């Protein structure tokens, strides 16, 4: 079991690539510039949709500008930025034509909120399942 913060990023990635039985726990910062083709990466688990922190000063300033012109900061800024990060996370899994794997998103909002469809439509077509976690785990076990 490897986790972000235990070692330098490049060392963690090398250890993860070298041991196909390892598990790497990391935040969305590992979604950019990471290439782990082949059997080392077979699953990506997204615990929550990657929305930016609304208290960030740059985010707050952009939100205020959108609001001043009568727009929706959530739909015009928060959702598009989160969708880009989400696509990056999903994109870690399939890097070559022969790669296969499973993405599990544990955030119910992807299915229960109207904006969740924007996330789903942003990724390539694939088999999708919305079910209790126990059923999802069983299906993942069969796929891998």
Which stretches of residues belong to each language-model region?
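ASCE RecA-like P-loop NTPase motor cores
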Residues: 1-144
């Amino acid at each position: 079991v490897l986790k972000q913060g235990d070692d330098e990023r490049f060392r963690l990635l090398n250890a993860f690539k070298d041991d196909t039985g390892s598990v790497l726990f990391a935040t969305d910062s590992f979604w950019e510039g990471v290439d782990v083709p082949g059997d080392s990466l077979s699953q990506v688990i997204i615990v929550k949709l990657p929305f930016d922190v609304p208290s960030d000063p740059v985010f707050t300033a952009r939100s205020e500008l959108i609001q001043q012109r009568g727009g929706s900061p959530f739909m015009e800024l928060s959702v598009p930025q989160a969708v880009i990060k989400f696509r990056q996370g999903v994109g870690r899994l399939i890097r070559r034509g022969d790669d296969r794997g499973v993405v599990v998103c544990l955030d119910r909002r992807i299915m229960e909120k109207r904006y969740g469809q924007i996330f789903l439509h942003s990724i390539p077509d694939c088999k999708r399942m919305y079910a209790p976690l126990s059923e999802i785990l069983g299906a993942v076990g069969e796929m891998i």
